[in-house]
């Protein structure tokens, strides 16, 4: 009898340990450790065209005679100098408003609308501008509340594993209880004692 109880205790402890091991949650930080595939630090790319040029022995030299152009005048003044002076004068000219107040008045800080902006047809443009949100390329670890509320209680893997483990433990306990009753009945004999003598019928008397 003691051996049976000891065997039953070992089976229950094994089932409980297995159910606890299955209900352990996963570490979310380990799921985000991915290896990037965009960088190749070990590989070195060599341009093969440069090697071909050196092997052919082609030298690209600038002809000194091409620098001497026939359009140069004897006075030493070049046409390029005149063009450079014109560009410098254009860059130095700046426009200033002075004390003039610009006609366009923007009130985007309060209402997000802009006023006094006219199109070609003298129509006021009162478009509402919404501030653009910065785009994040990296995935966030935040779980939206809508997805948490929509998922049912019995759809979680932890709940399903716990239910299965509890059912298995209940079956083991029920089977062991039935076996215990059968063994006890065989040891003690019949539960109902039979009478020693048998009563005679009244008809014979």
Curated annotation (Swiss-Prot):
Q: What is its main location?
A: membrane
Tissue distribution: Expressed in the animal hemisphere from the 4-cell to the blastula stage. During gastrulation, expressed in the involuting dorsal mesoderm and ectoderm. After involution, localized mainly to the anterior neuroectoderm. At later stages, expressed in the brain, branchial arches, pronephros, tailbud, and at low levels in the somites.
- Keyword terms, alphabetized: Developmental protein, Gastrulation, Glycoprotein, Heparan sulfate, Membrane, Proteoglycan, Signal, Transmembrane, Transmembrane helix, Wnt signaling pathway
- Membrane among keywords: yes
The biological process GO terms on file are: cell migration; convergent extension involved in gastrulation; neural tube closure; protein localization; Wnt signaling pathway
What is any one of the record's Gene Ontology cellular component terms? cell surface
A Pfam match is Syndecan
**Membrane-crossing residue ranges in chain numbering:** 163-183
Renumbered to this chain, region (Disordered) spans 26-113
Q: Give me the stretches of Basic and acidic residues compositional bias.
A: 102-113
The record describes its membrane topology as:
Single-pass type I membrane protein
Q: Which family does it belong to?
A: Belongs to the syndecan proteoglycan family.
Q: What does this protein do?
A: Cell surface proteoglycan. Regulates non-canonical Wnt signaling, being necessary and sufficient for fibronectrin-mediated translocation of dvl2/dsh to the plasma membrane. Required for proper convergent extension movements during gastrulation, which shape the neural plate, and for subsequent neural tube closure.
Q: How does it assemble?
A: Interacts with the Wnt receptor fzd7 and its signal transducer dvl2/dsh.
Q: What is the protein named?
A: Syndecan 4-B
Q: Which organism is it from?
A: Xenopus laevis (African clawed frog)
Gene name linked to the record: sdc4-b
């Amino acid at each position: 009898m003691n051996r049976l109880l000891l065997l039953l205790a070992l089976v229950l402890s094994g089932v409980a340990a297995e159910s606890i091991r299955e209900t352990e949650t996963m570490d979310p930080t380990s799921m985000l450790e991915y290896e990037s595939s965009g960088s190749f630090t070990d590989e070195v790319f060599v341009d093969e065209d440069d090697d071909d040029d050196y092997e052919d022995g082609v030298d690209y030299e600038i002809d000194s005679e091409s620098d001497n152009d026939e359009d140069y005048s004897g006075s030493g003044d070049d046409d390029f100098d005149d063009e450079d002076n014109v560009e410098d004068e254009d860059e130095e000219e700046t426009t200033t408003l002075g004390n003039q107040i610009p006609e366009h008045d923007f009130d985007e800080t309060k209402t997000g609308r802009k006023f006094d902006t006219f199109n070609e047809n003298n129509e006021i443009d009162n478009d509402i501008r919404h501030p653009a949100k910065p785009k994040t390329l990296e995935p966030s670890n935040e779980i939206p509340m809508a997805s948490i509320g929509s998922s049912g209680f019995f759809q979680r893997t932890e709940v399903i594993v716990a239910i299965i483990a509890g059912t298995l433990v209940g079956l083991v306990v029920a089977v062991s209880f039935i076996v215990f009753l059968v063994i006890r009945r065989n040891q003690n004999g019949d539960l109902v004692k039979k009478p020693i003598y048998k009563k005679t019928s009244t008809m014979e008397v």
